Amino acid sequence: MKNYIFFLLLSIITLNSFAQEFQGKAFYISKTKMDPNFGKNMPPERKQRIMERLKSNLEKNYELDFNSTSSLFYEEERLSVSGGDGRFNFMSFMSPFQGILHKEFGTKTFTNRIEFFGKFFLIKDSLPNSKWMLSGESKQIGIYMAYKATTSREVPEQVFQFGRQSENEENKKSKMKTVNIIAWFTPQIPVSTGPHKHGGLPGLILEVSADNTTVLCTKVVMNPNDRIKIKEPNKGTKVTQREYEQIRKDKIAEMREMYGRNRRRGGGSGNRSR
């Protein structure tokens, strides 16, 4: 135990003293399991069609550019599975992360640029103040020795469902739920960041599991020949995280109402409405 405490202290010292002149790029793969309650009010045939459309969105590849003061997290470019014309997109609601995320370590703030129904938003807010518990467990991830840390976080429950909801279900959607988070970090890369908004540990997070999603680092490139430029996104409507969640919730309610109207008319095409 004494050796473990000494190791952690050494890691923090390393983070402060050697993290001055370096940069790197980490590559991650994200896998999400479908929520078993998804589409519980939906006809089986329709649910199956949507599940097929969602498959490609449950596994994604991301990149994380980082230096000693900031990082930039984003999805690797690929052919779009849906148009960017502002049409309703089921897949966007199943992704645990959207857009481009810039983190500033010194101020512990983030800027997340997201496109939502054809409009760009700049979510600017404070990073979660995660209270990590270090277990002392370790494992090898690639060439790096990683150490286990756990925490929990309150997040909004998934607010989008198909079909008719009861009053109780409507009220439930505004509640929060507790998500347990397991992270594996390596002090060999002394930067306090990781995928999504995760960070605050004395080393790069190589693997993290939260809710139904696991993100695993597949490769790290330190100090590449081509210098990495980390720029904070600056185009879009500025909102806080809370304000964006309300905008998103209102839009989902609007789409649900539109979907219900189309069903009552017998069109069954709510998902194609603009």
What are the residue ranges of the model-derived segments?
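Extended soluble regions of mature proteins
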Residues: 21-274
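Bacterial Sec-dependent N-terminal signal peptides
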Residues: 1-26
